[in-house]
From Swiss-Prot:
Modified positions (N6-acetyllysine) in chain numbering: 17
Residues where N-eicosanoyl ethanolamine binds: 43, 109, 131
BP terms from Gene Ontology: epidermis development; fatty acid transport; glucose homeostasis; glucose metabolic process; lipid metabolic process; lipid transport across blood-brain barrier; long-chain fatty acid transport; negative regulation of D-glucose transmembrane transport
UniProt lineage: Eukaryota, Metazoa, Chordata, Craniata, Vertebrata
Subcellular compartments: Cytoplasm; Nucleus; Synapse; Postsynaptic density
Name under which the protein is recorded: Fatty acid-binding protein 5
């Protein structure tokens, strides 16, 4: 089972399935969805004890949030939503749960075969994004 430290580092997107459908379910407009589909972001994860930072960098946009594991905080997402978010490390996975306007979404990050697998779920829509470690 992975530790949060094993998720640390710079990861580059190499495969994505269902991202447009997931963004549509979030309520993201067509222009932002098209830009999001073209982006091949790097995800940089750092953790110092219970303090977590996740930065997403692409040529289009860079977003970042920092939090304490287990504590709710306000996150501004890449598409501009303000969410009440909590991150926990459970069963070898980093689970980010977002709530806003009576809606919710869960983003789970875990290691599988040396790759970072990110699963985004809202309602019955699931998106899977695969990242490889950048050395």
């Amino acid at each position: 089972m992975a530790t949060v430290q094993q998720l640390e580092g710079r990861w580059r997107l190499v495969d994505s399935k269902g991202f447009d459908e997931y963004m549509k379910e979030l309520g993201v407009g067509i222009a932002l969805r098209k830009m999001g589909a073209m982006a091949k972001p790097d995800c940089i994860i750092t953790c110092d004890g219970k303090n977590l930072t996740i930065k997403t960098e692409s040529t289009l946009k860079t977003t970042q949030f920092s939090c304490t594991l287990g504590e709710k905080f306000e996150e501004t997402t890449a598409d501009g939503r303000k969410t009440q978010t909590v991150c926990n490390f459970t069963d070898g996975a980093l689970v980010q749960h977002q709530e806003w306007d009576g809606k919710e979404s869960t983003i789970t990050r875990k290691l599988k075969d040396g790759k970072l697998v990110v699963e985004c779920v809202m309602n019955n829509v699931t998106c899977t994004r695969i990242y490889e470690k950048v050395e």
